[in-house]
């Protein structure tokens, strides 16, 4: 797909699907700055409350969460020059992506869970005190099973938004296993990029 000079490129998908990996490589490939919605300080501050799990039990918290996610996308759309904009928050405001390039990282749930557990183990190994809540234990342990349940809950909470985004016109579906091949077909209008290493 050709990119016009004014278009942002939105990269979204489930948590742990590979959005950040693809967005970073694509940013390098097409020479556009990367804007990660997860870096927003207000978003980071809400994370410990796990608002995505409280759609029914705390609707006010969930509504604040959704409003914040939508606001972050609105602000990103107004960036003065084209960017690669990456995050699950894009799923809350798909209409704001109209006229821009849309990419959905399409990764099977079992692969997302495996990735999430690996990421939790790496964070915990890096700093056990800071990341004690992310201890994923050893594979097959009760702790690992509990973290896998959490990953599944987050995925299931995003499923309606993922399905709605997937059905939008012009959405490019990029399977995680195909990143390298897909990136090799992305042209660079501002210079040459190397893509993602195999």
Residue ranges with predicted function:
Residues 22:
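Hydrophobic positions on the alpha1 helix immediately C-terminal to the Walker A/P-loop
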Residues 18:
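Conserved glycine(s) of the Walker
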Residues 15:
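The conserved Walker
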Residues 1-6:
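Phosphate-binding P-loop
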Residues 28-69:
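Conserved substrate/cofactor phosphate-moiety recognition/catalytic segment
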Residues 122-186:
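Small-molecule kinase domains that catalyze NTP-dependent phosphoryl transfer to phosphate-bearing small molecules
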Residues 11:
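Hydrophobic anchor at the beta1->P-loop junction of P-loop NTPases
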Residues 61-109:
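Glycine-rich phosphate-binding loop used to anchor ATP phosphates in small-molecule kinases
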